Amino acid sequence: MAHNMNEVRMLDFSVIGDPRGYIVVAECMKEIPFCIQRIFYIFGSKRDIVRGNHANKKTQFVLINVAGKSKVRVKDGEGNEAIYCLNRPHTGIYLPTMVWKEMYDFSEDSVLLCLASEHYDPNEYIRDYDQFVKMVCTEESLS
């Protein structure tokens, strides 16, 4: 079972421009596949720092590097993983529930915008990879 890895996907947002500059548009339940409950952004991270390192039971995310670049490693707990490079302000990545995420290789000017489907709840975060793998295996054995 691919535990939501098949739902991970890159998103392209509309860019509207004129001589004054550009606007990127992303609306809930259109380009963003959920209603946004929380917005935060990551900046000032060094290239060798890894952020994230967790999976979520309930929260979906869209990540957009609105400035600079970073990479996102996504794992399913069954040995499958993919790496995505976020380096354009009009593209993002959709991360469903129950995928392990690691953000890293931040450029000095990186600003990573994070859109979340749920308000913050520390109890729905899985911060130990071994525990995540066990949960994935348990879920598979129940299906």
Which residue ranges define each predicted feature?
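Non-catalytic, conserved peripheral segments adjacent to functional cores
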Residues: 1-91, 108-109, 115, 121-131, ...
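Well-ordered alpha/beta subsegment
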Residues: 88-92, 98-105
